[in-house]
């Protein structure tokens, strides 16, 4: 069965979920217009707008979610809330420049970048370009990598750290390269993707969350760290999903087959892992059997990547990836989605990391779940 036939077969379910998303989010978009939520407390969105919290890496997802809904509905309630979110984040550039980090792609590409591509807003374009320049400035020329976090409060020497998550930030560099006609941005993105392919992705398709590099000698790995997973050598499911989606995005931006091949390799590991648990992703695929910890956000991110792989490869091979995406989304919608109108979050059972923050609603879960449904609806808008 080809891609379009599978979409037609599942159209009733896809349309039904989209209607529920629109019904709930159209209300929440107004209720939380002056917030930038991360999670909820007693069903009500919290907000990361005060002080340095405005630089939280997740702050682009609320406005980005609004742009997804605007792309699919053209309703002003979504556009107004997305624009308000951008305005609130302007203090990052005026008051907290030293706090900006590698996740500026998450913060602005799906927010300001989406705004510019959907509406042509020049101010939004400038915001996204500023963020792209910030990301490019983190490139270590000697070590040949983009540095991840800033100096932490523990004062750990992390100058050589890279993380797999950053595969989702480099699409901002591909965009800036095209927008400015400056290939420096793309070259750095490609170098990062090639590094991640070599140093983060393992033979079995699982990934190293953190890789420690020599800061003065190019392409030299010192060690790997467990990061947000169970430990060194484990398989943190959200890290796997960042790689799965991130590499197919690099393929879409460059048409380099090696990135699609890598994405498919990672996808095989993800699919085989979730098949064992009814398509509900565990927090870490290689952790001990107990405690049983899940992470819905990994499933939502992976579904987005699987849909893009399916469209890229087509045919019977594409059916394998699209079927997996649908199975994951349907399992999560049935078991983990909250459609109560008096509660603000949708996708439950997100987990921050193995050590803490388990089984809670997290804004990027709602974002990627909605993005996946938008893709299935056939809306021609890639926010990355």
Q: Model-derived features: where do they sit?
A:
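Glycan-recognition and catalytic cores of secretory/periplasmic carbohydrate-active enzymes
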Residues: 1-384
């Amino acid at each position: 069965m080809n891609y379009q036939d599978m979409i037609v077969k599942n159209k009733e379910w896809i349309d039904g979920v989209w209607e529920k998303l629109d019904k709930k989010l159209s209300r929440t978009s107004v209720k939380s217009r002056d917030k930038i939520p991360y999670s909820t407390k007693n069903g009500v969105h919290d907000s990361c707008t005060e002080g340095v919290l405005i630089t939280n890496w997740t702050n682009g997802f609320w406005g980005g979610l609004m742009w997804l809904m605007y792309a699919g509905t053209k309703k002003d309630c979504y556009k107004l809330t997305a624009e308000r979110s951008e305005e609130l984040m302007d203090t990052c550039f005026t008051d907290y420049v030293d706090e900006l980090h590698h996740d500026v792609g998450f913060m602005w590409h799906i927010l300001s970048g989406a705004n510019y591509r959907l509406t042509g807003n020049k101010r939004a374009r400038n915001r996204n370009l500023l963020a792209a320049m910030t990301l490019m400035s983190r490139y270590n020329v000697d070590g040949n990598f983009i540095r991840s976090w800033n100096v932490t409060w523990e004062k750990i020497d992390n100058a050589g750290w890279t993380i797999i998550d950053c595969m989702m930030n480099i699409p901002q560099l591909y965009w800036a390269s095209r927008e400015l006609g400056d290939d420096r941005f793309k070259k750095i993105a490609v170098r990062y993707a090639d590094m991640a392919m070599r140093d983060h992705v393992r033979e079995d398709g699982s990934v190293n969350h953190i890789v420690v590099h020599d800061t003065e000698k190019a392409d030299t790995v010192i060690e790997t760290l467990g990061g947000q997973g169970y430990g060194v050598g484990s398989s943190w499911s959200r890290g796997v999903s960042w790689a799965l989606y991130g590499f197919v995005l690099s393929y879409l931006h460059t048409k380099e087959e090696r990135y699609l091949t890598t994405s498919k390799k990672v996808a095989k590991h993800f699919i085989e892992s979730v098949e064992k648990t009814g398509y509900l992703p565990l927090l870490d695929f290689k952790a001990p059997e107990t405690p049983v910890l899940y992470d819905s956000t990994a499933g939502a991110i992976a579904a987005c990547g699987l849909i893009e792989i399916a469209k890229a490869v087509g045919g019977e091979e594409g059916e394998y990836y699209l079927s997996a995406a649908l199975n994951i989304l349907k399992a999560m919608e049935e078991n983990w989605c909250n459609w109560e109108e008096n509660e603000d979050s949708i996708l439950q059972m997100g987990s921050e990391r193995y050590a803490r923050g388990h089984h809670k609603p997290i804004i990027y879960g709602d974002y990627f779940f909605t993005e996946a449904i938008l893709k299935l609806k056939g809306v021609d808008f890639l926010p990355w």
